[in-house]
Design a protein with these regions (language model features):
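Fe(II)/2-oxoglutarate
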Residues: 2-129, 159
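Double-stranded beta-helix
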Residues: 428-452
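Short, charged beta-turn/beta-strand-edge "cap" motif at the junction between a beta-strand
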Residues: 402-409, 413
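Non-heme Fe(II) oxygenase catalytic core, chiefly the N-lobe of the double-stranded beta-helix
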Residues: 41-42, 122, 127-130, 139-376, ...
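C-terminal catalytic subdomain
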Residues: 407, 422-426, 440
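Hydrophobic beta-strand signal
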Residues: 134, 401-402, 424
Length: 452
């Protein structure tokens, strides 16, 4: 068993949760998770983050013919879908150019005090457009540096049992519940920030089983990355499954407006939580495939890290990029253009070069059991070579959050002088499925297995 050098803080018991939303307001965790609807998840094999990101070059194995049938099922109106595709491509022209010109100015930095009193209308508009935000000043710098020192001591005390990736020189540590991590997850500034960010989501279905102002604790890993090139690179991707976005009926309903075709994609609401609650993100039960619903992914900085120092990269474009990613599998480059496109820069972006194809079973960038890869070949219209930008400099204690659908990556090289370190701490609400996840997370923790 891993050794912990200090006594852990007392954590509150699993009492009934009473949030501002209906659904869970009158039910305890026990009442929710004992239903047949939320049977225990199967125990996953142990693995590392490296295995999860193996397909980020965009190469995918062939899909069986049933996936062509799935495309036909989703495309109810060919003309409407073609109209939506052309409209999305047109808007992408201006949106990608804006990011190419402004760079990481598109990534908003706000002081913690703004979060405490509520963001302004202008700030909210920017956040919902870009899907990413840095919160500064909530955690004192020395406190965050103390967490990092505690993590180093924990690693040293358990050296023979520590796992991670790369295996010979670990950067991503498969450690989930050290003292420092629990202290960070329960820090008042993090909880307050998460409550606010979760409150930006809403329900479209009455009596939805969710409390959007009740954050729960999700056990995630941390990273301590020394200067130098990365052994493996986390290229551009979207977390929360890949082919599941289309294959799982509940997950597919999230993009209902986009798949309707025509101009309905403009009505897609990236902050409607209702259709996401029953979505299955891990149909293939893969190691390190997250099965909890995280509206906001996030990390808390443990170092001074800026562009070029192994930091996060994002595509600061939320709903428009999502609409494109959802529509992309239904279209292919016309044969006369495909034969001439020997490199990503040769791929024509004009709508007339693309054609609706429902006979092709392929889903570009998708691999069962992996994350959704985004490359210049699989998704050329996003122009990720110019639009995926490194976030501005962060200091120890700064919080970074990005929408669950946002395209993001990690810099391949770390050219700074010190380590680039973060604790991964997302904003996760109390829902019925997430309540069941907490039950299973507790069980796997007690058995010494990774989180489900």
């Amino acid at each position: 068993m891993l050794r912990i050098s200090k006594t852990l803080p007392r954590i509150g018991r699993g009492l009934p949760i009473r949030g501002p939303s209906v659904g869970l307001a009158v039910r305890s965790f026990a009442q929710v998770v004992q239903t047949q609807k939320h049977a225990r998840r199967a125990t996953k094999q142990e693995g590392t983050v490296a295995e999860f990101f193996e397909n980020l070059d965009g190469e995918s194995p062939p899909f069986p013919p049933r996936f062509a049938d799935l495309k036909k099922e989703m495309c109810a109106d060919r003309g409407a879908m073609e109209h939506a595709w052309r409209a999305v491509l047109k808007e992408l022209e201006d949106a990608t150019e804006e990011i190419a010109q402004r760079g990481n100015e598109m990534v908003m930095r706000v002081p913690y005090e703004d979060v405490q009193r509520g963001l302004s209308e202008e700030q909210l508009k920017m956040l919902k457009k870009t899907g990413v935000m840095i919160v500064t000043g909530g955690v004192p710098e020395q406190e965050a540096l103390g967490w990092k020192q505690s993590l180093r001591e924990y690693i040293a005390a358990n050296q023979e049992k520590v796992k991670g990736a790369p295996s010979d020189k670990i950067v991503f540590y498969e450690i989930y519940n050290s003292q420092a991590q629990i202290l960070a997850r329960t820090h008042p500034a993090l909880i307050a920030t998460q409550k606010y960010l979760l409150s930006l989501w809403h329900t479209s279905v009455p009596d939805t089983g969710v409390s959007v102002r009740t954050p729960i604790s999700y056990s995630d890993r941390f990273r301590i990355r020394p200067p130098g090139p990365s052994v493996f690179t986390l290229g551009a991707h979207v977390d929360g499954g890949s082919i599941e976005r289309w294959e799982d009926p509940a997950f597919r309903s999230v993009w209902k407006r986009v798949l309707e075709g025509g101009d309905a994609w403009k009505l897609y609401d990236a902050f409607d939580i209702s259709p996401r609650l029953d979505a299955i993100q891990d149909l293939y039960n893969a190691p390190n495939q997250c099965s909890i619903f995280r509206p906001w992914q996030g990390w808390t900085a443990l170092s001074h890290t800026g562009p070029g120092e192994g930091t996060l990269r994002v595509l600061p474009m939320l709903s428009l990029a999502t609409a494109y990613i959802v529509l992309r599998p239904f279209f292919r480059l016309r044969s006369e253009y495909a034969s001439k496109a020997s490199s990503p820069t040769d791929i024509p972006l004009q709508a007339d070069a693309w054609v609706l194809d429902l006979e092709n079973p392929e889903f570009p960038g998708s691999t069962p059991g992996k994350t959704q890869a985004i490359t210049p070949v699989t998704h050329p219209h996003l122009r990720i070579d110019k639009t995926v930008v490194s976030i501005p400099r962060v200091n120890p204690g700064d919080q970074v959050y990005w929408h669950t659908d946002l395209v993001h990556a990690v810099e391949a090289d770390h050219n700074g002088a010190g380590d680039s370190s973060v604790m991964y701490i997302p904003a996760v609400p109390l829902t019925e499925r997430n309540a069941a996840y907490l039950r299973d997370q507790r069980d796997t923790f007690l058995k010494g297995y990774p989180s489900p």
